[in-house]
Amino acid sequence: MAAIYSGIQLKLKNTRTPWPDKLKLARFAWISTQCLLPNKEQVLFDWTNHALTCFYNKKVEMPPEVVEGLWTYLDDILHSRKLHNVLSQGKTISLRLTVAQIINDRILDYTSGLRSVSFHTILSCCHGILTSPVLSVIYTAKYELLVQLLSRLCGLTSMQLRQQKYEEPLSLKAFEVLLVVLSNYLTVQKQQANSNRVFFQVTAHLLHPLLLLRHLLNTRVWTEKDDVKIRQNLSKEIRTKVDAVLQSALFLSDHLQSYKVEVSPSENEAGDRKSHIGKGLQGPLNTILTRICIHGASEEEEALFYAVKSNSLSLLFKFALDSFCRGGENKRVIFHLMAKLITALGFTDELDIDENFRASNWGICLLALENLLNSCLVGDIYNVAADRIQHGEVQFNFYRKVARLLFNNTQMGVPAWYRCLRALLALNHQILEPDLDELLSAVWVDAENMELRVRKAREALVSAVLQTYSKLRQLPKLIEELLDVVCRPAADELRPALLPEAIQKTLSQCLLDNPLRQNLEICGLILKRVQSCLLPHIQDETSDLALKVFSMSLLLHAVLFSFKTLDNSTPVPVVKQTLSLMTEMLKVVEDLLEQKLATKGPWMEKVQEVTLLLAHTWVEADALFQIHCTKYTSPSASQSSTLVDKALMLRNMDSPLGKLLQNLLALHKLKIHLLKSFSESSEMQKMAQFILNREELSVIHSLDQMWDFQFCNVNSSTYNAAHWFLVTSNLPLIAPYLDPNDRSVFAECMLKSLLQSLDASGSNLENTGISVCLISRQLLESPVLCELPEIFSALTKCIIKALFGLLDSSHMQLICPSFLTPPVENVEVKDEEMGMTPSMKRLKAIGLEMLYSVKMKSSVPLSKRQINGLLQLVKVTSVLNGYAMSYEDYLELFLTLLTLTSTIQCVEETNLSAFIELLKELFSVMASLLLAKNSQSILKVIHGSNLLEATMTTLFSRSSEGLFKSLDGPTWLSFLQSVQDFIQSLIRLIIDRKSSICLNLEKFTSFMVECNFTARVLTVDTGDLFSLQLHLVTLSALCREMMTTLGKNKQLDQALTHLLEKATAVMEPAIQAVLMGKGSCLLRQSFSVEVVTVMIRCELARASSSNDDGQEKISSMPFYRSFYQQILKELFPSPRPMDFLISSIHYLSAFHMAAEKTKVADLEDLHIEILQSIQALLSGTWMSLTDVKELEGPVKELLNQLMSNCSQEQFHLFLLMLREGLVAAKVEGGQCSEVLSAVTLIKLLACCLFPEHCSKAFWLITPQIISSLIFIIKESSKLPSLTRVLTVPGLEALTVLLRQGKAQISNPHQVIVVLGALQFVPLDSHCMEDYHSAFEAVHEALFAIIHCYPQVMLKASPTFLNCFYRLVSSVMHEGKQRSDTDRASEKDRESLLKCARLVERMYTHVASAAEDFTVLSSFMVAQYVSELQRVTLQPEIKAHLTEGIYCILDHCVEQDIKFLNTTLQMGVKEVFNELYSSYTHYHKSQRQGEEKYTV
């Protein structure tokens, strides 16, 4: 045999042996354990290497399949367990360098388009070599070979990334191999002794490929076709490795002197430059820039390479900053380096545009410039004083050149252009100050209306300018410059609004912090410009001039309405300055009001707008100053009202803004009258009517046009929204002075807008912006409307009128004529003698007419348009607050809805679904109205039983006519539910108001019993089950309400018991008819189960009210048992609807109670059967976590019922059942549903009330349960997919055990082990839902421990705080600021905010217990600031965490603060000092102030 096997080697070397045979022999030699070739592994490696080398050197020829087989053979060997075992034993095996070269060449061929063999196999071979420390020596020992491999792999992956438009999927293997190569290369690079050699190798071969790859990874638009592993993990890891390679190769500290020599412009460093020649790198920066400034072969490639260069320059500068500028050193070198990099973007040394620069590159160029300037800002390399004193303002002059570059080449449509200017402003405001007028013109006054991103960047820049000059206390200077720009001749008359919302908000904030004198100075400056620009030229009628003055008037209004008002503490000189300003302003307003403008047109409109705006500003400010400052006396108190009157006398006002300002002045006049002790109501009524302007409201259009609260944006399309907002926001002031006609017009306009809003969006309004529709909806839902009874009544009457307005009046005259008759016409002497008001007589007549119409089966036919119109009106009605309605309005609305429900009829079958929807909405609205306080008035108009009978008669009539035959199951069930809610609410009203309870209920029960018999006969004859189902729904509602009344009155109980017996007697045959009928498929199984459950509970209620043991009272027990058995069959074998499961569990609970009551023989078996069924249900593989959560409530109720009289044997059996599920091994075995079932039952069982013997048994084995749960948590936490499914429920069960066992768990070790389990719960899930559930579960467990076991918490405080720190750290990581593309959804942000609130809450609880371990307070603060230093938090997240840590700082004494300042590292110390400063300024002072008044 040895001879045979030894011949294998000879045959492999023999040139006559065919290559396919050689390959087979080689495979056999590797696999066979009996092949005893000496050093077999090395021999086979050498043979494979030789074969591949010969082929690729073209010394031999092979078929393609043999070449493919050789690579596959090599790959199989490299990844085999056998080779791994051989290498792990220390045996030396080596590959030849030619293999590495061949692999490198094949990668190059593939990138070039030559694809001869399976490239995936070659990459797999490369991966196998590099992941083996022994075999990877062929690359790591030859640095240049590894560089070549990395360069070619970068080219390969870059080629794949660039081919996105060809829709070819990315090769996962290529990126995996690239990451392995990068890791190996980084290790080898760090081991190189000669840093210059590394620099030249990287710049010559790797720099551009790596930067291109990084750029493509950053800018790729990832799609679902891309592999998730590449998108989420590999791309980030590769970018990190690339950064590490470049930074360590190009910016070593050893190279600093070389860079310094190259970029330093000083002549006195010439000697250093000469001495350095030959010692280090020559022109390293120039070498780098030469390598990255590559020109493309085409337009597309040229644009790509410029983008790579631009993005790379800011990255390289960041590397240089991190490497050379640690501790604030070498700032001057860094600056000169940055200057060179900025020049490399395509500019000359003087920062002019290079002749080869393309205009299309501006966007990318400005982004790079922005990043460079921001890095400069973050690195703090610009010290203004040092630059001016020591370096002759070198940096300042350079930044001035950058500013001029930006202004000379304005890119108004590029957001980065504005951000670059903002960065220069942040460096030093003096950089932009020489060009301040140009800046204000370009970005503020003359800026064009642009897209959202550009507008945001522009507004951010203007806001930054305002904030900067506010801090410098130079706002007057800035405003003066702004006024100069505004007053210049405009290139275009249509200038944008001077004060958009964002800029106005910033200006207001700046003015609040600004000294009052300066604010008054600003107002004076604006007023002087208005005087100089407008008054001398008022007859010139120049529209451009009017627009400018209007802009300045808006600015004056914004300034006066923004700074703090005068008060009694204001110094007298400031009051005098204010008085002088107000006097001058009054003079201007009066002069404008006295002007007589000859011609109409835009000029006149603008002048009137300016006049009214200044008048409104003056009277509001004057009134405010008078109210708050007694030192201030109005320039002319008598002239204030005269001024308003003159302004209101400006007629023929066509300008929308002018009309709005007149309304504001009228409102001011109304407020002034209200402040007086006596005022004429006629004058106030006149002002209120002027503000409302019912002529305009009656013809209002554009109800959905949005308005942004800005005066400058009030025009013909937005005026309606602005006017409606003014009216509604001041409704409490003007409503008392409106006559009925005004209120009616207001209500009609409001209803019209509400209906239009429903037409536009289906059922609800979109809460974006302010429009007439949105304002009306918000007013309808707000409590303000409820507090205005006249307006509310007008709206209710308007809705009633609209409901009848859609119907044919001739039909309504026949059915219910009293609706169309005013109340006064119904007055009769007899009624007056009886004390009945005309309105009550009318309403009673309506009720009688409605009952008569039902009896006579009268109807009103409806078209499709009428049905849709009524549906919209009913939806609006559903939002009305029934508690706010007057007695008469409530009754009229309810009777209107009831009449509609009883009489309307659908004439077209095509509209049937909309008609059923209308009926459903009508029943729902009536049910909600029955909950209001005036609901008892209904029973004074119509007897309760008559109302119930009329409703059911109509429904039975509709059913017999076949109205419901074509309905699908969900629609029919939804309709039944609305009917049931209404019937139940009405019966509850009869019972609660004690309105002849026995008489009404007995009459209605008898009516239903008689109708039930008729319906069953009809069902047998026609197969129509709808009437029968309506009977069952109604009888169920009737029985439920009667059951809730039992036990209050003995005589009443006897009557109700009789009625319950009467009702249940007919329900059993009815439900059996439904179950056997063909139409039962329309109903869900839950319907039948709920009905039978009601029947059982009725019988139980009757049995409980009787004196005997109840055995003979439950007569239908056989029927209930058969139903029970059917439920057990259908409960868990396969998926079932959730409503069926919930109703079935309720039925099991009721049936068990009935079984206990009747003392059935097999009660113990029944008990175990139910428990086994519930466990099997919860263990179902189809049950999701959401389903289990939804079933927890019903199952808890059932367990309480089962455990209340549980025997010791039954309880023991149940615990044994649970023990089988609490096995951690089942998690690994994939039986998670069984484990979840046991965990859920344990959690619910802990909340049950046990008999004493069961309670002792349960809490005795609780330590074992806790241990099992901990093992389950540990096992499930290994798989991220099980976090929410099993880990969190297990933790919730532990928390419940801790809370419920507060008095029973005495061993502290049982609590401490729970703390240990919390360490295993993963808090790094990619899914926010999983993260939030895990976070909340850990928090609740910690809260249970701190609340129920404070002594244990103190004993194990380090472990407790470590668990809590995991929460803090995770919420900081998740709550860090992210880019726009990586920003979380609104739902995720809300979940994260909840987590932050929980952390704040826990901090407060820890702080309340911190008095017992104050030593750890400083430790908690140190942990917090250390984590805070690493991330930039979202403001709302930071706010909650900061409030929480403040509570811990309350317990830090001075010694702790000194300790923290001493031990914390430099960066962390700065964060702590900032935190402690804000704590001292805001929180500590407030707390001390509160303590001052605390007893």
Curated annotation (Swiss-Prot):
Effect of loss of the gene: Mutants show a notable decrease in the population of hematopietic stem cells in caudal hematopoietic tissue and early T-cells in thymus. Compromised cell proliferation and excessive apoptosis are observed in the caudal hematopoietic tissue.
A GO cellular component annotation in the UniProt record: nucleolus
Keyword line: Nucleus
Subcellular location: Nucleus, Nucleolus
Pfam family, one: Urb2
GO biological process, one term: regulation of hematopoietic stem cell differentiation
Protein name, per record: Unhealthy ribosome biogenesis protein 2 homolog
Highest taxon above the source species: Eukaryota
